[in-house]
């Protein structure tokens, strides 16, 4: 804004959807930078880590996700991404279909067995 343009690359659209219209409007019209702690509070970022620790934290998160059932991870990503493109009713219908698909998967059976046997699951993505 301070240099005669608005945020591009979807900035105005994503900001309004994530932080709300009022916060997005203030940020877009003033052009003032947002502090990391405020970005976290508004939901623009999911966590703030100390400077220099970003890669380590990203790897830790990736390793955690890698232990989860791959089919459920993939379909979970699809469900959340789909939610951003449609209204609530179609989003719930899409989620229900994915849930039923996962409920019939080998990974779900393995996950339930592993839980009952108090051991980590051995997931195959099927």
What kind of region is each of these model predictions?
Residues 1-73, 101-105, 110-113, 117-119, ...:
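Crotonase-fold acyl-CoA enzyme core
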